Amino acid sequence: MNRLILCEGKTDAILLGYYLMKTDGWALEKKPPSGLDIKAQERNENVVWYKKGNEKLMICAVGGIDNFGQFFSRYIQRPILNASNGDPFPRIALVTERDDRDIVEIERDVTEQLSPFFVGTKNREWITNNYLDSFGMEKQIETLLIIIPVEHQGALENVMLDAISEDPYDKNIVDKCTAFVAAIRPEANRYIATDRLQL
């Protein structure tokens, strides 16, 4: 079975892939399954395959929060609709960062981007979507939206810093680094102008 994770950016894709390799036994795979040789075409996109036993996983950086729909329609939709021997991706996970937005707003935005192929998305809940393939057969695809972090606004980097900070020794290092970056930010504004870069 093939699995698919769509995420916002290259850093997210790299971190997710690394995490899955270290915690769940996935390994980099150079050869994609037949008919799924999907290549990123834009500078801010990325496509990497992983393998674990007979399962394959493709993690794609779509190039930003507003590009889920465009990336899906350009690269993913055609192989799904034209599949003659099963479903290439029966389950798709969408990983996005909360940043400074509300969860309901993100669910609505992602659903609008992927409409009409997906009828809805809900944070941390599998949703079944029905569609007709190019042969007129009714099929189903399940989607899971994962908004990171759930507890507060922020990005994947916030989750990593929170996890590192669970150890008192490492928390001290994180706190000192955060204070250092905050102190130099006025002078280094040209290099760390956004809150995201300050993380």
For each of these PLM feature ranges, what is it?
Residues 87-198:
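Activity-critical C-terminal alpha-helical subdomain
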